Design a protein with these regions (language model features):
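Surface-exposed loop/edge segments in extracytoplasmic proteins
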Residues: 3-16, 116-119, 224-227, 319-324
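OB-fold nucleic-acid-binding modules
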Residues: 60-280
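Surface-exposed coil/turn segments at beta-strand junctions on protein surfaces, enriched
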Residues: 19-21, 32-34, 82, 134, ...
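Short, surface-exposed linear motifs at loops/turns and structural transition points
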Residues: 1-61, 280, 290-300, 310-316
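Acidic surface patches and DE-rich sequence motifs
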Residues: 45, 220-221, 326
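Core beta-strand segments of extracellular beta-sandwich domains
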Residues: 198, 296-305
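Surface-exposed binding patches on compact interaction domains or structured appendages
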Residues: 280-283, 306-331
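Surface-exposed loop/turn motifs at beta-strand-loop junctions within extracellular Ig-like
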Residues: 43-47, 145-147, 256, 306
């Protein structure tokens, strides 16, 4: 906006990109609202620095916006849409990034202390490493209209395209209290930590049996199906058993696959009421056998968890039926 012909570009403040990629991004910080600035990209070569064209602008302060108001804007979109202004949002990380029961680069962020729906969203940036932030961190995020995008993705409000360098940690260890809801309210509370009570499952199982493969489990809660999703990256759930139980509770992030509601446990603490602490039979294959009237023989393979030195014990069978344990996992 002013005269930039006399700027000594060799001696101005320079900020290097965090990664040598093309294209690259750099956060320009410390600007004063209302002041005019000139900026240009540069690259360092073996023969010295080379410069791009000069761009000028007047700095303006981002507008503070509540998470609830931003969620309202996001829900009004039908496709990926640039945000309409520079914004600053502040909230509490309510998922557990280190447990990774979410897509890589996902942060679930909610309004501090919120107990009503529409107070959380997803921040998505694959340059954010799981160990960078923790459950209970309070963060402030600057969203630039030139790059940040908003959309409803898998029924959840999501922001992408922001610069990871403009995520500032304000505090840590804040209390995150799940909201007790029913299964039919999961989509309303998308991205928020919730607790479902009166949960039942008739058969024990394993949360995640394969290292790089996601899994889903169907529980019942007050007569409704409750789908529990474990992401392929959630390694803390690998080969961890859960027990058959009536009237337990499960906690996690309210989420969805497309429009089908799911619960995403943030960590093993969220599923502790179904923890298998002793020897547990997790599956029998085949799960059902049928014999002809002339009789017959079938082999059953028993899968267990926490078996240790315990052995399989058989209960008495019906008249004319007998069984024996062959090698502690085969009947």
């Amino acid at each position: 906006t002013g005269d930039v012909t006399n700027i000594d570009w060799a001696n101005v403040a320079k900020t290097k990109a965090q990664e040598k990629v093309s294209p690259w991004t750099v956060a320009v910080t410390g600007l004063t609202s209302g002041s005019q600035y000139a900026v240009r990209a540069y690259a360092t070569t073996s023969t010295g620095d080379i410069y791009g064209s000069v761009e000028t602008f007047t700095a303006s302060a981002p507008e503070a916006i509540s998470i609830a108001d931003l969620v309202t804007k996001i829900k009004a979109t039908t496709e990926v849409t640039p945000i309409d202004n520079d914004y600053i949002i502040q909230g509490i990380i309510c998922g557990d990034p280190e447990a990774q029961n979410c897509s890589y680069g996902t942060l679930y962020v909610m309004t501090k202390g919120a107990t009503t729906a529409g107070n959380a969203l997803t921040l998505y940036n694959t340059t954010i490493k799981p160990e960078t932030y923790s459950l209970g961190d309070e963060i402030k995020v600057t969203l630039r209209k030139e790059s940040a995008k908003m959309q409803v993705y898998n029924s959840a409000p999501q922001i992408s395209g922001f610069d990871a360098a403009e995520v500032e940690k304000i505090s840590s260890g804040n209390n995150v209290q799940p909201v007790t809801i029913t299964v039919d309210k999961l989509l309303d509370f998308a991205c928020m930590p919730v607790k479902i009570e009166n949960v039942t499952i008739e058969t024990a199982g394993i949360w995640k049996t394969e290292v790089d493969k996601a899994s889903t489990h169907t529980f019942k809660a007050n007569g409704s199906d409750l789908t529990v999703y474990i992401n392929k990256g959630a390694n803390s759930f690998n080969n961890v058993a859960y027990i058959a139980k009536e009237n337990g509770s499960l906690t996690g992030i309210a989420a969805a696959y497309k429009t089908s509601a799911q619960l995403l446990p943030r960590n093993l603490e969220d599923v502790k009421e179904f923890e298998a602490t002793g020897p547990t039979i997790t599956s029998v294959a085949p799960s059902q056998v049928n014999f002809p009237s002339t009789g017959g023989e079938e082999t059953l393979i028993i899968s267990t968890s926490n078996q240790g030195s315990s052995t399989l014990q058989l209960s008495p069978l019906g008249e004319g039926i007998s069984a024996e344990v062959i090698d502690n996992n085969t009947v």
